[in-house]
């Protein structure tokens, strides 16, 4: 009987969660255990509905396809779902900043909803995109089925459980108060187990490959998986107050704690949001334009430069703090050095279109990927510039930093993920084309306009903030109180919410387009000017 082991494990887990809820040392841990119990119970019921009690027929149900794409399909759907959720929460957070009365105490105030937004976009949307695409890419480039059988399912569902536990924990107020590492110790332990399984599945597939060469995209994926594991374990070293309680204390304190946190925080950007998505760039752009990578040698140089330099750049988040000055300067120097290899990768991605530049005009998926690479180039110039101490003295703690982060996260990570989804969906579900190519074009313009409005407004707001904070009168007193600087941000915060709403509208359009494609629908529409005629809808 299929799924017997899985059902037993889920049932035991649900029972232990119930015991944990009953013996909890604090109210929050008890509430979280109830969340875990219902999540595992739901998983058990879903599996029970899929159980086939008939004996397996040799050679028929047991026959395996060449590639394990079912888990990739689930990953693509999860990426779209969590993306819409994350962007929606982001718009809510933006509106809360502009209109404080929208803060609903205690569960939906800004302090709890903001980490929900960042984690939903980075780890739920971005993480599912990376897991799904890495499983797809490693199988194709290795010419081998995903290693470990149902291990891929464990990685996928285990990661969804992590997302649910983290998100519910934020709303309950269970947090370590460490940016991008808010989940408490028991959620961190679960993610560690899932991540090790992810590494085993990915590395095992490479080791049993039939293709002698390891394609460069797999280098970037593997670097992302290994480095994130190291960062996660070290930064989340903590001592629980009780094994049946939600509270723990970090193994680090003071300046060491701050440095460890931003060693983790910046390299989460460097390896989660950069290396992993560069792997997507190096696979999906050549596939979509049907051209080889412009310079494979440059891609290898790009890889090793990123690996060596990025890990040192974290201290630039701690300029003008108690961190030793030499450490701040070290972070600044390595940040500036990162500019050149980052732009080398950008040039490599853009020049892959050599001989196919017309596709930017005729193929909105290519246009989306190219815009993503352009935002990558812009963000990797702006980041090193902001790490320079003189510039940082103005930009630090202002909304300029928020604009920088979103131009990278939405412009680079968001658009390259959207492009990958549009590439994958017709292939995974054996469709001739997407439901609507023109909707992709609309999505492109909504997303691009939303990012530009958001980032530009935050750049202006941040510079104004920095200048107001440092404005002194003739007697050496501050000209503006902090409350006045906050009040001055109101029009910018409203415009930011509008930019986020445009980006969300594009994501909703994508969700509809993807859903209709999965259902096998095709919209009868005129081709984009200059493009080849679209296949006619089936009768």
Curated annotation (Swiss-Prot):
EC number of this enzyme: 7.1.1.9
Protein's GO biological process: electron transport coupled proton transport; oxidative phosphorylation; respiratory electron transport chain
Membrane topology: Multi-pass membrane protein
Free-text comment on the cofactor: Binds 1 copper ion per subunit, denoted as copper B. Binds 2 heme b groups per subunit, denoted as high- and low-spin.
Pathways involved: Energy metabolism; oxidative phosphorylation
Cited SUPFAM superfamilies: Cytochrome c oxidase subunit I-like (SSF81442)
Binding-site residues, heme b 2; high-spin: 404
Residue spans crossing the bilayer: 4-24, 28-48, 75-95, 118-138, 154-174, 187-207, 214-234, 265-285, 298-318, 330-350, 368-388, 405-425, 443-463, 475-495, 499-519
Keywords: Cell membrane, Copper, Electron transport, Heme, Iron, Membrane, Metal-binding, Plasmid, Respiratory chain, Translocase, Transmembrane, Transmembrane helix, Transport
Family per record: Belongs to the heme-copper respiratory oxidase family.
Extra facts: This cytochrome oxidase is probably a cbb3-type.
Function: Cytochrome c oxidase is the component of the respiratory chain that catalyzes the reduction of oxygen to water. Subunits 1-3 form the functional core of the enzyme complex. Co I is the catalytic subunit of the enzyme. Electrons originating in cytochrome c or a quinol are transferred to the bimetallic center formed by a high-spin heme and copper B.
PANTHER family reported for this sequence: CYTOCHROME C OXIDASE SUBUNIT 1, CYTOCHROME C OXIDASE SUBUNIT 1 HOMOLOG, BACTEROID
Protein name (Swiss-Prot/TrEMBL): Cytochrome c oxidase subunit 1 homolog, bacteroid
Originating species: Rhizobium meliloti (strain 1021)
């Amino acid at each position: 009987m299929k799924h017997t082991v899985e059902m037993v494990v889920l049932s035991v887990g649900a029972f232990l969660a119930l015991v944990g809820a009953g013996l909890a040392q604090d109210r929050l841990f008890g509430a979280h255990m109830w969340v875990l119990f219902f999540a595992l119970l739901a998983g058990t019921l879903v599996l029970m509905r899929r159980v086939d009690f008939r004996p397996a027929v040799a050679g028929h149900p047991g026959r395996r396809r060449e590639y394990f794409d079912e888990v990739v399909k689930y990953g693509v759907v999860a990426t779209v779902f969590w993306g819409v959720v994350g962007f929606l929460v982001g718009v809510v957070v933006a509106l809360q900043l502009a209109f404080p009365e929208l803060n609903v105490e205690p569960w939906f105030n800004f302090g709890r909803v903001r980490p929900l937004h960042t984690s939903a976009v980075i780890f739920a949307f971005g993480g599912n995109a990376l897991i799904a695409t890495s499983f797809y890419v490693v199988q194709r480039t290795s010419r081998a089925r995903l290693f470990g059988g149902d291990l891929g399912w464990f990685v996928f569902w285990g990661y969804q459980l992590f997302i649910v536990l983290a998100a519910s924990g934020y709303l309950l107020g269970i947090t370590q108060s460490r940016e991008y590492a808010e989940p408490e110790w028991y959620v961190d332990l679960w993610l560690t187990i899932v991540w090790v399984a992810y590494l085993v599945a990915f590395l095992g597939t490479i080791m049993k490959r039939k293709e002698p060469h390891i394609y460069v995209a797999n280098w970037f994926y593997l670097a992302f998986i290994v480095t994130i594991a190291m960062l996660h374990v070290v930064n989340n070293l903590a001592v629980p107050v009780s094994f049946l309680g939600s509270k723990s204390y970090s193994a680090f304190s003071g300046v060491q704690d701050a440095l460890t946190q931003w060693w983790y925080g910046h390299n989460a950007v460097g390896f989660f949001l950069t290396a992993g998505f560069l792997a997507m760039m190096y696979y999906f752009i050549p596939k979509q334009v049907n051209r080889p990578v412009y310079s494979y040698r440059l891609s290898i140089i790009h890889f090793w430069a990123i690996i060596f330099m990025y890990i040192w750049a974290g201290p630039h988040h701690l300029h003008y703090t108690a961190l030793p000055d030499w450490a701040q300067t070290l972070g600044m120097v390595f940040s500036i050095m990162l500019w050149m290899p980052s732009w080398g990768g950008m040039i490599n991605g853009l020049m892959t279109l050599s001989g196919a530049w017309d596709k930017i005009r005729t193929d909105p998926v290519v246009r989306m990927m190219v815009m993503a690479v352009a935002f990558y180039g812009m963000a990797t110039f702006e980041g090193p510039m902001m790490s320079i101490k003189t510039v940082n003295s103005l930009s630090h703690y202002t909304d300029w930093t928020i604009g920088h982060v979103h131009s990278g996260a939405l412009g680079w990570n968001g658009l390259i993920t959207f492009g990958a989804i549009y590439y994958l969906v017709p292939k995974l579900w054996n469709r001739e084309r997407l439901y609507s190519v023109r909707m992709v074009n609309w999505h492109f313009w909504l997303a691009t306009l939303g990012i530009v409005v958001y980032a530009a407004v935050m750049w202006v707001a941040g510079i104004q903030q920095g200048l107001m904070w440092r404005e002194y009168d003739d007697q050496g007193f501050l000209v503006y109180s902090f409350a006045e600087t906050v009040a001055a941000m109101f029009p910018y915060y409203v415009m930011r919410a509008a930019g986020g709403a445009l980006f969300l509208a594009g994501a909703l359009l994508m969700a509809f387009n993807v859903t209709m494609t999965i259902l096998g629908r095709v919209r009868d529409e005129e081709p984009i000017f200059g493009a080849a005629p679209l296949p006619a809808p089936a009768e």
